[in-house]
Amino acid sequence: MIKARYFYLYKLIVRCRFFIAKYNTLFKQQVIEFYIQNGKNYSLISKHFQLDSRTLRHWINQFNHSRINGLAVLGKTRNYSLKFKLNVIQTVKNGQFL
């Protein structure tokens, strides 16, 4: 039941385009530079930067394919007030979807 609630919240967020980039391009670039300079161990680097190793692998693949442009954050990130975010969560809890 709890997983279903999170799934609905996720769907609502995706549908409303509430996507907020977790990592900016500069951070991704720093991680890639560290990867290139200090060896190619996904596990150690992902632990050092507290990343999921799949995320690191994805960034490296993007970098290898398109260089720095592949790391760019696509789309416009938005900042929402705490009040708005709580309102969205309350709406999901009450089952009132779009």
Swiss-Prot record:
What organism does the UniProt record list as the source? Haemophilus influenzae (strain ATCC 51907 / DSM 11121 / KW20 / Rd)
What is the recorded name of this protein? Uncharacterized protein HI_0112
Q: What is one Pfam family matched by this protein?
A: HTH_28
* InterPro entries linked to this entry: Homeodomain-like_sf, InsJ-like_HTH, IS150/IS1296_orfA-like
Family, per the entry? Belongs to the IS150/IS1296 orfA family.
The family database entries (PANTHER family) matched by this protein are listed as:
INSERTION ELEMENT IS150 PROTEIN INSJ
Instruction: State the source organism's domain of life.
Output: Bacteria
